[in-house]
Amino acid sequence: MSQGRGKYDFYIGLGLAMSSSIFIGGSFILKKKGLLRLARKGSMRAGQGGHAYLKEWLWWAGLLSMGAGEVANFAAYAFAPATLVTPLGALSVLVSAILSSYFLNERLNLHGKIGCLLSILGSTVMVIHAPKEEEIETLNEMSHKLGDPGFVVFATLVVIVALILIFVVGPRHGQTNILVYITICSVIGAFSVSCVKGLGIAIKELFAGKPVLRHPLAWILLLSLIVCVSTQINYLNRALDIFNTSIVTPIYYVFFTTSVLTCSAILFKEWQDMPVDDVIGTLSGFFTIIVGIFLLHAFKDVSFSLASLPVSFRKDEKAMNGNLSNMYEVLNNNEESLTCGIEQHTGENVSRRNGNLTAF
């Protein structure tokens, strides 16, 4: 019964994670449509400090869509492993890229289409090989996991690294090195996902009628989540303000997801009972998503489509045929000139002989 319940929860979490990606990916399109609508009306743009978007219903629809996506993502952690939910967040980028090509007339080149396909394949592989059962079901179990020596050492190291990056490395190299602010967001993000996971369990217990609000861990997790998310937003905005978005997005996804997977492996031990083939499959799916996200962002400004391939082949073929024709013409000209030369030389010899005979 417990095993069947675990699989049932897994598929609920999977559905919530995928619906979250659809809502969040669609929210960017709705917001963008609203902002473009305001720009056509001549209103002051948001980038110039304007707030006219607050009167645009499309922008509010995008905000509500994003809120629904975040709620679904939050709930997904209560049912499915973080190893599955976090990497599936890449699907929101994919949804946004596909919808923007249809509704915003933004071209999705061949590299982007291949990237989308790879992201879908990688996500499918991760769904197949991700752990199906969740070990932690109560806050008491969560508190025992948080007190595990392995996680205490990991958490201590993460806090030390984050503090060094924030107070020592950041002020010196944050403006020039893209990895500084992204690393801060990523290592702190590992804690935020763990807090979300714990709060999701607390909400499940609350609906079951248990006195969760009296448990100090629930409030500690809530406070930690607020601190972690505030720090993440602060340093992610700094990275986006200084560096190119097409570079920040894939690097942040890789660093953040790697931190979450590492934290989940240590705290929840989701990988402990996984067969070797499932571990390899999960990692393969993750790296496939990374390649897909890289192709989607790194070459998004390159004008290259499927129609470009046969054109280039035809150009090469024409060039080759042209070269062969030129060579043929040159050979013909050489033959003709050689023939004319021989005939002329023969004619001169004959006329000389005739002249000699006449003189004789």
From Swiss-Prot:
Family per similarity comment: Belongs to the NIPA family.
Membrane topology classification: Multi-pass membrane protein
GO cellular component: early endosome; membrane; plasma membrane
UniProt keyword list: Cell membrane, Endosome, Ion transport, Magnesium, Membrane, Transmembrane, Transmembrane helix, Transport
InterPro entries, per the entry: Mg_trans_NIPA (IPR008521)
Function of the protein: Acts as a selective Mg(2+) transporter.
Catalytic activity: Mg(2+)(in) = Mg(2+)(out)
UniProt protein name: Magnesium transporter NIPA2
GO molecular function: magnesium ion transmembrane transporter activity
Outcome following mutation: I178F: Found in a patient with childhood absence epilepsy; uncertain significance; loss of cell membrane localization; no significant effect on magnesium transport
GO biological process, one term: magnesium ion transport
Tissue specificity comment: Widely expressed.
